[in-house]
């Protein structure tokens, strides 16, 4: 979004061209680089800069619910773009997705992904160093994965509806400050 305070304008979007083809937004879409199914539903999208990237490049990572559904386009055939599930609870896998976005080239590409327990709604993903913490909200689980996408530990909660988000923070020098 450009001019966020004076008159916001959407400068570009990441989305499936086929979904947006009959709208005025299609010209705003970045080009998908590579062969992968675009995210279907997404939660906790995180913008990440990196000193190794060129100006105009950044990462976006997210919990990809892997669901094809839209209240504004109930007739859209999501299976035509690889999203075969439209149920909040009956899917097999959701995914952790990480894109490299290049504003200069007008592209986005999938640079990392792995399957996680399915959750059609809610949920979260957080990079913690080399690891990734994933909350599959409708399953009531959260798992920390190592750099090779192997589960380190999984927790399951008794819950009535779902776990909305899970985050991991260090509180060094915050609550437990050393006193001299």
Predicted regions located by residue number:
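Histidine-/acidic-rich catalytic cores in large beta-rich domains
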Residues: 1-180
């Amino acid at each position: 979004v450009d001019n966020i305070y004076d008159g916001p304008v959407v400068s570009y979007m990441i989305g499936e061209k086929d979904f947006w083809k009959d709208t005025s937004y299609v010209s705003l879409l970045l080009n998908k680089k590579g062969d992968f199914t675009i995210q279907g539903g997404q939660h906790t999208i995180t913008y990440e800069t990196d000193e190794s990237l060129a100006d105009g490049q950044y990462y976006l990572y997210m919990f990809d619910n892997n669901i094809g559904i839209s209240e504004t386009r109930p007739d859209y055939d999501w299976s035509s773009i690889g999203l075969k599930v439209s149920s909040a609870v009956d899917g097999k896998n959701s995914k952790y997705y990480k894109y490299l976005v290049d504003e200069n080239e007008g592209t986005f590409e999938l640079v990392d992904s792995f399957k996680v327990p399915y959750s059609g709604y809610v949920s979260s993903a957080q990079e913690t160093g080399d690891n990734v913490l994933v909350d599959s909200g409708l399953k009531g689980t959260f798992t920390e994965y190592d750099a090779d996408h192997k589960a380190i530990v999984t927790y399951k909660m008794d819950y009535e509806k779902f776990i909305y988000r899970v985050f991991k923070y260090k509180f060094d020098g915050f609550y437990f400050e050393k006193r001299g």
